[in-house]
């Protein structure tokens, strides 16, 4: 069944206000909603809802009814999300990646798993995160370090992508993990990868933009939060992220270019977090912080 995106183009402030209007109406129906920046200099943002094409008329009508009282000038636009077989396109030449004891591999490399490896099977697909990017590998290394040295009873993987980091946590420690992403395609891919790795019962998957979901209060607070996204949203959501962290908990942040690390550290130092370690990989950094 084909998927579409209905969206409005506006400013950052108005996009957040639109999101606040949409959340109580669409959240219980598991229709993903999100805001995204289009042009920083011009303050152009989009507020979107993702749905199946068969539901367009109903959702469009309710979306329009929400907008009309407060934002009658906003026009609902439509984007058809293409069905692309990224797995078939991406598998060729994809080699296993080692990060600490983890070995991230595709289904075509199962014969390369060693007896002491913690194997995570992820085929390249429509969601980010096969272990080949420096940020994913840096997160896996840091996950291993944190779980070996800290008492961790539950974890959050914010912006899960392929689910590789949530799977890594669950393979190392038998604890509940909440994995979220704003992209419904990513959540679908992550759910398949979790099933493929045989740990479906331990990972809860939710489509959620930022912290706009009741799932965080239901499953949190968290002893470990992993967020491999981008520097700008990491900085913006620092107070919210730390608010969902249990006392004494740990945070792993990535998706950060080396030159952006000081701004990210400043945001989390301001939120009373303590810097523990930074891992550098191919121009990207992964930052580990603890809450005192």
Swiss-Prot record:
Main location: cytoplasm
Catalysed reaction, written as an equation: L-lysyl-[protein] + 3 S-adenosyl-L-methionine = N(6),N(6),N(6)-trimethyl-L-lysyl-[protein] + 3 S-adenosyl-L-homocysteine + 3 H(+)
Organism: Rhizobium rhizogenes (strain K84 / ATCC BAA-868)
Residues of the signal peptide: none
GO CC entries: cytoplasm
Enzyme class: transferase
Entry's EC annotation: 2.1.1.-
Family the UniProt entry places it in: Belongs to the methyltransferase superfamily. PrmA family.
Keyword S-adenosyl-L-methionine listed: yes
The protein's role, per its UniProt record: Methylates ribosomal protein L11.
Subcellular location: Cytoplasm
A Pfam family the protein falls into: PrmA
Residue stretches in coiled coil: none
Domain of life, per lineage: Bacteria
One Gene Ontology molecular-function label: protein-lysine N-methyltransferase activity
Keywords: Cytoplasm, Methyltransferase, S-adenosyl-L-methionine, Transferase
Gene of this entry: prmA
Annotated residues for binding of S-adenosyl-L-methionine: 136, 159, 181, 228
UniProt entry tagged with the keyword Transferase: yes
Biological process annotations from GO: methylation
Gene3D superfamilies recorded: Vaccinia Virus protein VP39
InterPro entries: Ribosomal_L11_MeTrfase_PrmA, Ribosomal_PrmA_MeTrfase, SAM-dependent_MTases_sf
Protein name: Ribosomal protein L11 methyltransferase
